A protein has these predicted regions:
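A structural signal for well-ordered alpha-helical scaffolds and beta->alpha junctions
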Residues: 54-58, 95, 147
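Conserved active-site segments centered on acidic
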Residues: 1-87, 152-156
Length: 156
């Protein structure tokens, strides 16, 4: 069976989407499902990518993951590209602005592949950007909840 390919997306790919990538990876590894999924993350913006080289995960995001025993070493920001549409089955954005930009980058035929993470949860809404709030603990909580709900939906 071919693994389901999931791309988590946020604005800069240094906080929320890499947190989602590595939280989801941990979840599937713990459940023995690592072979069932291929997981990555990317940015809608190039703000964290200079001369083709992406910045590493923002230190407070990396530290929040580490508090939960999750490592993200080696991860660097990459930008979502139109050709990713054929490489991934599902694109999961963190907020409404990400979703708008994902539609712009991926094009009209991507509509059924683009979802917002918190829409998988009963409360919906956006994952607030901790870059502005400095609340990486809240971002972790929301992303964890969203990833749990996403995995449950995919396994249903």
């Amino acid at each position: 069976m071919k693994p389901m390919r999931i791309m988590f997306v946020c604005h800069g790919n240094i906080c929320r989407s890499p947190m989602a990538e590595f939280i989801f990876l941990r979840m599937i590894e713990e459940r023995g499902l690592a072979n069932c999924f291929s997981v990555a993350s990317s940015a809608t913006s190039t703000e964290e990518i200079w001369n083709g080289i992406g910045n590493p995960v923002y230190p407070p995001a990396r530290e929040e993951l580490a508090k939960h025993g999750i490592t993200c070493s080696g991860k660097r920001a990459v930008q979502l590209r139109s050709d990713d549409l054929t490489k991934y089955d599902l694109f999961v954005g963190m907020d409404s602005a990400n979703i708008r930009n994902m539609h712009r980058i991926l094009g009209g035929s991507a509509a059924d592949k683009i979802k917002k993470l918190m829409d998988y949860t009963p409360r919906g809404g956006d994952v607030a950007d901790p870059w502005y709030s400095d609340r990486f603990d809240i971002a972790y909580r929301d992303i964890y909840e969203g990833c749990e709900a996403l995995l449950k939906a995919l396994l249903a």
